């Protein structure tokens, strides 16, 4: 029986980061975590391309264009949506996650979900590098591993 399993080697991988700028005081830490993770796992900053968009809602359409370009082995979506007093959070977060999932399925390029969807600023801070780790790092590891699995299939 053959078992296909990915590894965490980023050497030679071309990774696109699509970054929602809204809540940049949080997102900047996610981006740093993503870049550090790629480099720590043998990747090169020369093989990383950052594409900045206004916010989380715009991430899926840009990720779709990036995936269709054929330039990337993996795409990492990074952003932060923090709940406020209106239903706006639900619409933005829901459409973002749905759109990112569709891009991955339709393109065959792994698109890792590193968009924080949290109730409070404290929760966002925790997930951007303090108590709960850095979700930018975690989703980048998932993107690296998935890209390596797909290369074997």
UniProtKB/Swiss-Prot annotation:
Pathway: Cofactor biosynthesis; riboflavin biosynthesis; riboflavin from 2-hydroxy-3-oxobutyl phosphate and 5-amino-6-(D-ribitylamino)uracil: step 1/2
Entry-linked NCBIfam families: lumazine-synth, PRK00061.1-4
SUPFAM superfamilies membership: Lumazine synthase
Binding site for (2S)-2-hydroxy-3-oxobutyl phosphate: 85-86, 127
Domain of life assignment: Bacteria
Organism: Hydrogenovibrio crunogenus (strain DSM 25203 / XCL-2)
Gene: ribH
GO molecular function: 6,7-dimethyl-8-ribityllumazine synthase activity
Keyword hit for Transferase: yes
GO cellular component: cytosol; riboflavin synthase complex
Amino acids binding 5-amino-6-(D-ribitylamino)uracil: 22, 56-58, 80-82, 113
Name of the protein: 6,7-dimethyl-8-ribityllumazine synthase
Family, as annotated: Belongs to the DMRL synthase family.
Catalytic activity reported: (2S)-2-hydroxy-3-oxobutyl phosphate + 5-amino-6-(D-ribitylamino)uracil = 6,7-dimethyl-8-(1-D-ribityl)lumazine + phosphate + 2 H2O + H(+)
Keyword tags: Riboflavin biosynthesis, Transferase
GO biological process: riboflavin biosynthetic process
Subunit description: Forms an icosahedral capsid composed of 60 subunits, arranged as a dodecamer of pentamers.
Active site (catalytic residues): 88 (proton donor)
């Amino acid at each position: 029986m053959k078992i296909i399993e990915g590894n965490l080697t980023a050497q030679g991988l071309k990774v696109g980061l699509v970054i929602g700028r809204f809540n940049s005081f949080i997102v900047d830490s996610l981006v740093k975590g993503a870049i550090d993770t790629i480099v720590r796992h043998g990747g090169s900053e020369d093989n990383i391309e950052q594409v900045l968009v206004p916010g989380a809602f715009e991430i899926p359409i840009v990720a779709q264009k990036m995936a269709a370009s054929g330039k990337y082995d993996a795409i990492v979506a990074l952003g932060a949506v923090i709940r406020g007093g209106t239903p706006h959070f639900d619409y933005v977060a829901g459409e973002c996650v749905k759109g990112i999932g569709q891009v991955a399925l339709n393109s065959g390029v792994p698109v890792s979900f590193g968009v924080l969807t949290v109730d409070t600023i404290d929760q966002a801070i925790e997930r951007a590098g303090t108590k709960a780790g850095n979700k930018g790092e975690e989703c980048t590891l998932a993107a690296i591993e998935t890209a390596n699995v797909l290369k074997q299939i």
